[in-house]
Amino acid sequence: MSTHLRKLPGLLLCLLLALPAWYLGRLFPIIGAPVFAILLGMLLALFYEHRDKTKEGISFTSKYILQTAVVLLGFGLNLTQVMAVGMQSLPIIISTIATALLVAYGSQKWLRIDVNTATLVGVGSSICGGSAIAATAPVIKAKDDEVAKAISVIFLFNMLAALLFPSLGQLLGLSNEGFAIFAGTAVNDTSSVTATATAWDALHHSNTLDGATIVKLTRTLAILPITLGLSLYRAKKEHDIVTEEGFSLRKSFPRFILFFLLASLITTLMISLGVSADVFHSLKTLSKFFIVMAMAAIGLNTNLVKLIKTGGQAILLGAICWVAITLVSLAMQLSLGIW
């Protein structure tokens, strides 16, 4: 059997799990399809006995389909629009990202969490949830159970944010503009930002959704420097790319991140030339579906019992990051006169 044919059973299995997960994600956007995919994968893994037939395809999906999803994610970024609208929120975005990464780094040894899980929780909390985890996991060579743990933590606090933040914003007296920035900087995943802003709009008959989404997309750009920094750090630590001249940036930089940037530049250029943004909608949708497929593969490679036993510390780290980001986002708004 050829290499491609050996991958087919595992690919089909991930596809079959992704389809109901995608449907459930549409029904319950506050949870999201990636979480359903991981759950379905982990549940099936408890009973699944034909791993030899599907192993190669599952591994291919969790690595290469995931990287392809990140590349396609770039087609959802019009850099001109993001920079024009997101510049006001840039100081807040930088502050919240720096806070989450520093908190994750500082708490990792104290909580006795493995470095990869702490890194994934940090980038997932600070940048863009599942998409940031998807982009970072291959760079740091995270294991599937570490990815599943981080995604589960991010999901938990996404759900809490969507439920609590509209009432918190009202209690604090945030303006519509202030809440859009708050939701865009303090909520992790795009679907949860959408749910949070929509709940606020329903309460106040306003339109914060567009502003919150663009702030969120501006955060997504942080994937580039963060993944580059992590890849260089890992290369230096492992001494696997050292030459007489020093580091080779070409070898250190993950190629799929370069293609992500290229996709963003193509989108920006085409839209500036008058091409409708709707042209790229199908690629954005395909990116999301590929992430769901990859999460199904990660679920299939994850031990659910072990995840439950070892997940408490990761949840605590996620809570610390979440509270820190929330406080910094509000404090920065106050200092900048937005709130």
Curated annotation (Swiss-Prot):
The chain crosses the membrane at residues 7-24, 28-50, 57-79, 84-106, 118-140, 150-172, 256-275, 290-307, 314-336. One of its GO terms (cellular component) is plasma membrane. InterPro entries: UPF0324_pro. It is found in: Cell membrane. Keywords: Cell membrane, Membrane, Transmembrane, Transmembrane helix. The keyword Iron-sulfur does not apply. It holds the Pfam family Cons_hypoth698. Belongs to the UPF0324 family. This is UPF0324 membrane protein M6_Spy0799. It comes from Streptococcus pyogenes serotype M6 (strain ATCC BAA-946 / MGAS10394).
